[in-house]
């Protein structure tokens, strides 16, 4: 199944209040497959939240579990494995697409100060190592899971 997806839902684009939740910046909105909406939420959170491989794994599981729970509460009776396939494949494919963006940021001196500020790292080398760790989670760990799910 497909649905309307925001495709850029992460903390800077999500406002919480007593009245509810509001999503900002719908420029990337479009159709998405089951599980796909989680990709930007998890992937971008990894760049802004004290990343470790353990943190990434916990975030991945917590977000996916809450997603399935929300689908169930809304009446969806589908196979959670299919949602996991959509999520892991999307995480891998978008992770590959983002490598070029990471490289462009790292080689552009005009971006370096902002990168240091945003990622709270002292050097471009530290930022590159940080980016590599995030990509390792997405392009090794999650890609392996996607491959395993697709093969079973």
Where are these regions (language model features)?
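Conserved aromatic-histidine-acidic binding/catalytic patches
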Residues: 1, 26, 51-55, 59, ...
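Active-site acidic catalytic loop and adjacent metal/ATP-binding pocket
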Residues: 1-36
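Secondary-structure junction/capping motif
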Residues: 33, 79, 117-118
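Active-site activation/catalytic loop segments of kinase-like enzymes and analogous catalytic loops
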Residues: 35-75, 93-112
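Charged/polar, solvent-exposed surface patches and flexible loops
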Residues: 40, 69, 85, 89, ...
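All-alpha amphipathic helical-bundle segments outside canonical DNA-binding/catalytic cores
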Residues: 76-93
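ATP/Mg2+ or Mg2+-diphosphate-binding catalytic cores
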Residues: 93-152
